[in-house]
Amino acid sequence: WGEPDVLFAREGSFCRQPIQVLASGRWIFANWLCSDSASGLAGDPTAFQISDDQGCTWRTVEMPGSNGRVHANVVELAPGRLAAFMRSRAADFIYRSESLDDGNTWSEPVPTVLPNNNSSISAVKLQSGRIAVAYNPTHTPAPQPGVAAWPGLRCPVAVALSEDGGLTWPMIRHMELGEGFVGSE
């Protein structure tokens, strides 16, 4: 092994998902740009590192209107059409954004019907084409507008399925109903 190289020098780059290889061969790496603040919401936009040469060079694409929408999970709905699902620092809902051009531009995130208490989520495309999201289906009680609400109980755990790229979620199953974990980040 040689000396490690800095892949992304921008301070505050934070990720939770692996690099994904799209049908086009493009690499996309979802992250968010964390900065210190008293409210926990000083920017914190979602961004994507994109490479068209297998990681030799990268460029950054920021998602508009994404402050406080973090830990994007990118799902390739069809070649060139992507959806990103994010947890909410406001502890209200899971948010969704879409790209119709292989990640070059993104829509502003909009809330889904799935609640979120600012705990991590995981979204994947199944072989059937459905989208599955694992999450904690709770809100944080009485969050303050403009201030990050930190997760409380991380239970129950549920999995929701969508047949339309994450626009609707008609199938939800609670997988773990136990007392869960009360944590701070």
What spans do the regions from the language model cover?
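Asp-box/BNR beta-propeller blade signature and adjacent active/binding-site loops
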Residues: 1-185
